[in-house]
């Protein structure tokens, strides 16, 4: 899994350290919603059943480099 330096840095935060790489890969492959930001970055969401929360993964425009990943408390599935 390709990542940015920013992601590698934020991954050290306690709330982010518990996010499993398998969950990130799941979101990338099985999003319930996808949005493209004006800067070309791609946001994807999927529910992680183990924690009953929605994980948002932000990818660079290449569609494979992870820039950020966190549980999105405000996400509501359409």
Residue locations for each model-derived region?
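Ribonuclease/tRNase effector modules and their secretory precursors
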Residues: 1-78
């Amino acid at each position: 899994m390709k990542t940015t330096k920013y992601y590698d840095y934020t991954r050290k935060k306690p709330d982010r350290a518990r996010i499993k790489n398998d969950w990130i890969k799941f979101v990338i492959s099985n999003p319930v919603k996808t949005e493209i930001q004006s800067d070309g970055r791609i946001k994807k969401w999927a529910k992680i059943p183990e924690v009953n929360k929605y994980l948002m993964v932000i990818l660079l425009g290449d569609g494979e480099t992870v820039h950020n990943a966190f549980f999105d408390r405000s996400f509501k599935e359409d």
